[in-house]
Amino acid sequence: MGFFSFVQEIAMDLGTANTIIISDDKIVVDEPSVVALDRHTDKMIAVGSKAKMMYEKTHDNIRTVRPLRDGVIADFSACEQMMRGLIKMVHRGSRLFSPSLRMVIGVPSGSTEVELRAVRDSAEHADGRDVYLIFEPMAAAIGIGIDVEAPEGNMIVDIGGGSTEIAVISLGGIVSNNSIRTAGDDLTADIQEYMSRQHNVKVSERMAERIKIAVGSALTDLGDEAPYDYIVHGPNRITALPMEVPVCYQEIAHCLDKTVAKIENAVLSALENTPPELYADIVKNGIWLAGGGALLRGLDRRLEEKINIPFHIAEDPLHSVAKGAGIALKNVDRFTFLMR
């Protein structure tokens, strides 16, 4: 990239939990989708991990915002500021001016026209000149290394923070899809509610997330893969005295059961709407899991036992969508499924 390069190409996975930006085939930004704003002027104070550190710790003059909810933009102004702040990280200190941007952005396959317009407008306000949108399951498939233009059926289950995207892909298009607003954030909320109800301990969203990462599971028997118990510190809900509660993966598996069952049912529903020829391909190729939710212990095994089709976890599930958007960026003229 030259000093006087006027156009910069970036691919973005604009997620509810994290935003990932790829430029020149490299992941240059991988930050939480959080922005901290001055409550009086609405000016941005911090973005990404710096803003996440302030989350749930602010005073009256600062508000921290997660601009996306359920995979779509919930706060347009905050999203625009967040995108601008994260894009600045891409060309930090390397130029005298900001270049105009050619962008490919991943969006949920269940997005309405209004939601797609909101993403495009945010990108254009953040200096995007050529903005292309790609449905997240399609981007994930490309990122995993699947030939999406082949006359063959492949199924992707992309479990993000705000939505789960399930799609059957063949010949460069989405044949059937199911987008549900049940995903990683719901698992975190389940843990928060469970800790309060079962152990009388108040835990923040961030603490619930740490519990999910440490002992989250979709199965009550993980065998040799079982994690150690996690010690939770927090105030007693009734007395406000400090508590120390050990939590094991089996109880978390029980507390996540209903949300995981919703994801199972969504996969079954997408399979019901799949043409028989493509269904046969999926049984042969297996189903691919991508997104942060794919990292939930035992999820692949649980889905396999329920659905009787092999499940594979993507090599790098957190970055599959961003990597796929990056490959699409290089093939803008060839990939007809990109939306302008």
Language-model-detected regions and their locations in the chain:
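Nucleotide/phosphate-binding catalytic cleft detector across ATP-hydrolyzing
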Residues: 1-159, 167-287, 294-340
